[in-house]
Amino acid sequence: KNFKPYLIINLAAQPGVRFSYIRPDIYLRYNLNGFLNLLEVMSELKLTKLIYASSSSVYGDAITFPTNEKSELRPLNLYGETKVINEKIAEIYQKYYNIHSFGLRFFTAYGSLGRPDMMIAKSIKKIKKKEIINLYNNGKHTRDFTHVLDIIEIIFILSKKINSFKGHELFNICSNNKIKLNYLIKSLEKLLKLKSITKN
């Protein structure tokens, strides 16, 4: 109780979509209860500034492009649902408990220490092992990839702005570039100097 930070940055959560079908209890415990517990502690200690991680998963299969913060929320899985609920919880705690926050909807974060179940890491591994990479729709699906260093820089900038901010605001954190997955695979081939084996 003697430690009174001016800002809490919460990036903790159980990530991933597929695992949410296997262990939904973990997503409810960490993503919902964990977030609620954090806000309760902040309320008790009179801490009023929060930056927290949300996700582009709140949009599901977006029907508007480019997707902006006012786009319809259509989560397709429990992971996305927990992020939508977190945003609602943050809004309630701002209104009734004076906790002002920025929610950051990250779009496919990547980096050198990225999760092994993510597209880039999985593709690199399969190219090296000469395993088949399944590409649907001839690899024409697109994603927006955001490097972790860009994410850190954005969080740093927002950490300076939140000091004088009152309210609850959501931000899409992305590169604003739609990358086709077949283009991604070709780029990885060039970097690795190896050919991939793809299947449509």
Per-region residue spans from a language model:
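N-terminal Rossmann-like NAD(P)+-binding domain of SDR-like oxidoreductases, especially those catalyzing
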Residues: 1-109, 190
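Residues in well-ordered alpha-helical elements
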Residues: 6, 18, 25, 36, ...
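A short, amphipathic alpha-helix embedded in the catalytic core of nucleotide-handling enzymes
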Residues: 38, 93, 122-127, 154-158
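A glycine/serine/threonine-rich, flexible loop-to-helix segment
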Residues: 65, 116-126, 188
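C-terminal substrate-binding subdomain of Rossmann-fold SDR/epimerase-dehydratase oxidoreductases
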Residues: 127-200
